[in-house]
Each structure stands twice: as C-alpha cells, then as structure tokens.
A protein has these predicted regions:
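NTP-dependent small-molecule kinase module
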Residues: 16, 20, 24, 70, ...
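Conserved glycine(s) of the Walker
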Residues: 13
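Active-site segments that bind and position negatively charged phosphate/pyrophosphate groups
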Residues: 368-481
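A glycine- and Lys/Arg-enriched "phosphate-lid" helix/loop adjacent to the NTP-binding pocket
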Residues: 93-137
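A glycine/threonine-rich phosphate-anchoring loop and its flanking beta-alpha core
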Residues: 140, 282-375
C-alpha cells in the first residue's frame, strides 16, 4: 500500500525514472518485468515464446499482486499491465498511479534496439502506431501524468516527487446508478485534482466557487496546481458561512457562470466547507439543467458528510435546506492537509458527524474512536486518515444503496431533527452544525431510551464520546417557542407528526420513528434546560 506505480508505453522511461525516484525518496524500486523473469527463471522473450502473450499476462497479474504487497515502493509496471481491468483496480487501491508519456517519434528513437521486447520485433513505428492509442486512453486515467520528452530522468523524478500525495491514499467508490464516482482521501491532493479536471474538462471552461475564508488559504495552491497541468480556471467567491446559502449568493454564482461562458460541458469546482458545497452543488444542479461539478471540501464536516451523497440546497426564511436538489458530483477530493489550519471549533464540529455515522452503522468504528479520540483531537495524521476513510466508507455505502433517501439513508439524519431545529431557532450561522447535531444526538439518544427503542450502553457511549470531543461544553441558548416552531417545520415531519431516527444499539439505528410530542418536549426540556 501507498506505493507509486509507474505506467506508460515501452520506452517512456519507467525504469530509468523509477530508479531515480526511488533514490530521491529512499524507497525500494521494483521493476515488474525483472520480477516476472526472475520468478519464471526465463527472460520475458522466452516466456512469450513458450507460453504466448496470454501466459505472460497471467504471470504479469500475479507478479503485480505480489509487488503491490510492498509498502512505499516505486513499481515500474509493464506497458500493457494496466490494460487488464483487474490489474488497474489493484494498482489504484491505496496507491498512486503515475503515467509517463512520450511522443511516438521519441518512443521509436528510444526503442530502435528492441532487445527483450517481444511485441516490438516487427516495424517499430507501425507497432507504436497500432498499440499506443488504445494504451494511451488508459494511461491518461492515471492520478498524475508527466511527459518525458526532452527531459532528464532526475528532473522528471523531482517533479513527480513534488506532486505525489503524502502519507497514504484511499479511494472509496459511490456506486449511484448512472452517476458512479469516487472519493479520494489523502494528503497533498491538489495535483490529483488538477489531473482529474484535465481529464474531465479538456479545453472546456472551469469555475472554482469558494468563500472568503477558504479562498484565503487554499485557492492559490489549487490554481497553481491547475496551471502546472495546463488548466486555467475562473474563481468566484461567495460569503463565508450560512450567508453563502442565501438566494442572493446563488444569484451571483449564476451571473459568474454566465460571464465566464460556462456551458453544458463546463465544470464547476466547489472549494470550501459545507455551505460552499451546498450552494455550488445547487448551482451546478440547476445551471443549464445540470452541469458537472467536483467537490473539494476543506472542513472535516464537509469531508465526512455534506460533500457525499449529492444533496445540494439553499436556505429560505422558512427553514434550512428547503430548496434543493440531488445532484451527484463527478469526483470528491478530501485533502486532509486542509485540516491542519482548520479552527479547533470547526474540527470538533466535524467530529460530531464522525461519531454519528459510527454510532448508527459500525460498532467497531465506535470502539476505534473510543481508543483513538485523543490522537484524533491532536490531529495525528494516521488517525485523521483512518477516521475520515471509515466515515466516508460508511456514508458512501449507505448512499450507494439508497441514493434518493427513500429508506436506509435516513439513518444518516440521526441527531438532525433537533439539530436543524436548534440551528434555525438560534439563527442560521450562530450555532455550528456539528455542535447542533451533537445536542440533537443527545436528545435522540434519550428518546431512544425513554421510548424503549435503545439501550443504556448506547446512550452512555454516545454521551462519553461527545463529551470527550468537547461538543457538549455549551448548551445552545434558544427560546422554547422558537425551537418548537422549528421542529414543526422540519422536512422529516409528516402530517404534523414528529419523526426521529432512534439509536437501537451501538452500530444500529431505526428511521421514521414517530415519537409522542409530549415525550419530545419533556426530553428537550431536560437535555437543553429549557
């Protein structure tokens, strides 16, 4: 895991650059063809002669599987290795794939002595012309792509090293019918975002939507990464916080999209927290009846919650998120480097959603959090990577099974019935979402117990985690009447009845539970001291 896999056509420089990169980074180097030959006790040419290409490809897949068991290695794959879908999936699982390219004439010059290359025994330029187009389509799906034309291996390896993700890389699939996409989780991902946009947009226009807070920290590095990939993008800023989700902010995005000539083939990039993602996603959902967008969340809350699932919305005076649409992004990149400068209160707010998703879906994750919460609060990098990976994987699985929230996905609303009501009663923007959800979870946990649906162990465990995370330090100050009115406006209420997600036990929740309003009110009064 966390290997760098070099792919590219014969003669693109994988072995030479790979050795340079290994020397530069202090990592072991593995040449896949050399490993295959050593295992077989024969040259690659002899394997082709004795077993044919099909036999060689089977050996190649086995050799790749063995090589990928290494940690932090530089692996030079064969030119045809990534063409097998199963090989490609293995390469991308926890590893960074880097493609090296060269012009056909340069490849022909480098390959003029094709010793040991069984597929190059005939006319070399013709062979390149026949094989390269199909292979190039796969190479360009790599995380990073570098041309080796006219550049020394040391220079290429330096550029690769500067752009590699750091400290591990995870990809989580969200298999929504007709809109499947991935969440990439790691550190130092701006260059991976740039390459993805290069694939998606080609020469089409791109606009980055951010807010004043995120832009001040993160826009310039992203734009620089885009420029290094040969991409230009317009930048449009919306107000920070919940003000980003007002109709007037949405209107300014529409105006900027028009001014920049963003058409149906254009791409919108959301760079910011949950509010930016919500309004930018809603703009993408409605501009020209829907354009593609990429989520680049910069807060923990957005990484583990709002960026996943395609929910987009703006606020109205009558309530939070009342005007919205489900519009899936084409990719999500959660760069944990952004969390290093995140305010402590914002980081803790994101922890509420991590605790929530563990409580409703994965007891082992709850156990992990109980042990590792101190490290997580200290922003230990391996702890952050593991927590975000697990939280994203849980939500991605739920969304894949229920993309339109007609059933199971409702469990992700645990704590949100009261949480959203608290946000509205306090005034949007005055109470952080995670803090509101934490208190909403406290209420829902008590309701679970008092209604006979839950267990004392679950409520105690929840309370301990929320308290240790610093999420219960200050009770929200709201008026009783305002809170009750907000509850009645909740989207999950039906025919005036209050419906809750209740915690059945650690790792399991029930949704759509109708609760006696008197019990709700009594519990609110006790938990919130109303």
């Amino acid at each position: 895991m966390n290997n760098v896999v070099l792919v590219g056509f014969m003669g693109s420089g994988k072995t030479t650059v790979g050795r340079e990169l290994a020397d530069r980074t202090g990592r072991p180097f593995i040449d896949l063809d050399d490993e295959i030959a050593a295992d077989a006790g024969r040259s690659i040419a002899d394997i082709f002669a004795d077993e044919g290409e099909a036999g060689f490809r089977e050996r190649e897949s086995r050799g790749l599987e063995h090589a990928l068991r290494q940690d932090d290695a530089i692996i030079a794959a064969g030119g045809g290795t990534p063409l097998r879908d199963e090989n490609w999936r293995e390469m991308r699982s926890g590893n960074c794939v880097v493609a090296l390219t060269a012009e056909p004439a340069e490849l022909a010059r480098r390959l003029n002595r094709p010793k040991g290359r069984p597929l190059l025994q005939s006319d070399i330029p013709s062979t390149i012309a026949a094989l390269l187009p199909t292979r190039m389509a796969r190479y360009l799906e790599a995380d990073l792509v570098f041309s080796t034309d006219g550049k020394p291996a040391a220079e290429i390896s330096r550029h690769i090293d500067a752009r590699l993700p750091r400290g591990g890389l995870h990809r989580i699939s969200i298999d929504v019918p007709g809109a499947a996409h991935e969440v990439t989780v790691g550190f130092h991902l701006a260059n991976l975002v740039a390459q993805a946009l290069r694939r998606l947009a080609a020469s089409r226009p791109i606009m980055v939507v951010s807010d004043s807070v995120a832009a001040g920290r993160h826009v310039d590095p992203l734009i620089e990464a885009l420029k290094s990939a040969g991409i230009s993008a317009a930048v449009h800023l919306v107000p920070a916080g919940e003000a980003a989700k007002e109709l007037r902010a949405l209107s300014t995005i529409y105006g900027a999209l028009a001014d920049e000539g963003i058409d149906r083939e254009g791409v919108l990039v959301s760079l910011g927290g949950g509010s930016v993602g919500d309004v930018a996603g809603f703009a993408a959902a409605t501009w020209m009846r829907g354009i593609r967008y990429v989520q680049v969340p910069t807060t923990l809350l957005a990484m583990v919650d709002s960026s996943i699932g395609g929910k987009t919305a703006i606020n109205l005076p009558a309530g939070k998120n009342l005007a919205g649409a489900v519009h899936q992004p084409v990719a999500i990149f959660s760069d944990l480097e952004y969390l290093e400068t995140l305010a402590d209160a914002e980081f803790r707010s994101g922890l509420a959603e991590i605790i929530k998703v563990a409580l409703v879906a994965d007891r082992s994750f709850v156990d992990w959090l109980s042990v590792n919460l101190v490290a997580l609060l200290g922003r230990d990098k391996p702890a952050m990577l593991e927590a975000v990976r697990r939280a994203v994987a849980i939500k991605a699985g739920v969304v894949s099974r229920d993309p339109h929230e007609t059933g199971e996905r409702a469990i992700l609303n645990y704590g949100h019935t009261v949480g959203h009501a608290l946000e509205r009663a306090a005034g949007f923007g005055r109470l952080r979402h995670g803090e509101a959800v934490a208190w909403g979870m406290e209420v829902a946990g008590r309701l679970s117990l008092s209604s006979g649906a839950g267990t004392p162990e679950a409520v105690r465990t929840q309370h301990a985690l929320l308290q240790r995370a610093g999420l219960l330090a200050n009770r929200p100050e709201v008026k009783r009447a305002d809170l009750w009115q907000a509850l009645r406006h909740d989207k999950k209420s039906q025919a005036g009845a209050l419906r809750f997600v209740l915690l059945r036990e650690i790792g399991r929740a029930d949704y759509g539970c109708e609760v006696d309003p008197n019990l709700v009110w009594d519990t609110l009064a006790k938990v919130l001291s109303l």
